[in-house]
Amino acid sequence: MKTLREVACGQTVTVMRLHGEGPVKRRIMDMGITKGVPVYVRKVAPLGDPVEVTVRGYELSLRKADAEMIEVE
């Protein structure tokens, strides 16, 4: 499986699993990123940090480390 960090701009993927523990995982889930949710990758900064995505109709910027914890398909 690949992570959200590996997804190219303009692609829509589905969240399959969240890695991480405790507060980090909770923060990602509080942003609306949960299993089964479609995520559209809008932009990736030149060095890969941050990644700009659209989730549930709103836009988010995720750190590279957070994007690596989100397994997608």
Which residue stretches match the model-derived regions?
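Compact, glycine-rich, soluble single-domain proteins
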Residues: 1-73
